[in-house]
């Protein structure tokens, strides 16, 4: 699906986003979490609206053609935007395979990566991460007190592809393994991010209906499974 976004052939200085939507939603009865609807919009629609404030294209990483077909009706609401799909080629490799497939599909040097069940991704924070990553290998949020990270809410350069291949060759699939193998990663402290998003809703993901209720209040009767 393409639109007004003008991207030259090959790699450009544009910004891409990779949305990892291939999860099976086991904790929600195998539903497509990206299609959960509350307050009149699906999670995917909310996510795309936020991302397109700061990126030129979005790549949806999905598991197969049937899942792609389920998501297509949402994409029809974005006729003038560049949205493409990519598919895993390795089975049971987790989100790292989705990132690999997305980076291969991306037309940009830098891509923001997030999960498909994150309805409140903050475009200002995505913009901040792109600015921090510029000229480096990646920009990764870090919880400074306990040294934990947000690898599925980060900006990565194409340099990560080589490290991902090395990770798979070593029979590992942790997202942080190739991140730490890169030499020039910028860590963005959560305290700085909190200055933009005090409640840190940008990191929130949906695993259960209760998660939605806790984030936006009672939505009983509004959630369509």
UniProtKB/Swiss-Prot annotation:
Residues the entry annotates as binding GTP? 20-22, 33, 88, 117
For this protein, what reaction is catalysed? Mo-molybdopterin + GTP + H(+) = Mo-molybdopterin guanine dinucleotide + diphosphate
What this chain does, per the record? Transfers a GMP moiety from GTP to Mo-molybdopterin (Mo-MPT) cofactor (Moco or molybdenum cofactor) to form Mo-molybdopterin guanine dinucleotide (Mo-MGD) cofactor.
Q: Which Gene3D superfamilies match?
A: Spore Coat Polysaccharide Biosynthesis Protein SpsA, Chain A
- State the needed cofactors, names only: Mg(2+)
Listed Pfam families: NTP_transf_3
GO molecular function annotation: GTP binding; metal ion binding; molybdenum cofactor guanylyltransferase activity; nucleotidyltransferase activity
Q: Where in the cell is it found?
A: Cytoplasm
Quote the record's domain comment.
Answer: The N-terminal domain determines nucleotide recognition and specific binding, while the C-terminal domain determines the specific binding to the target protein.
For this entry, the protein name equals: Probable molybdenum cofactor guanylyltransferase
Which EC class is this protein assigned?
A: transferase
- InterPro entries listed in its UniProt record: MobA-like_NTP_Trfase, Molybde_CF_guanTrfase, Nucleotide-diphossugar_trans
Q: What's the EC number here?
A: 2.7.7.77
GO cellular component annotations of the record: cytoplasm
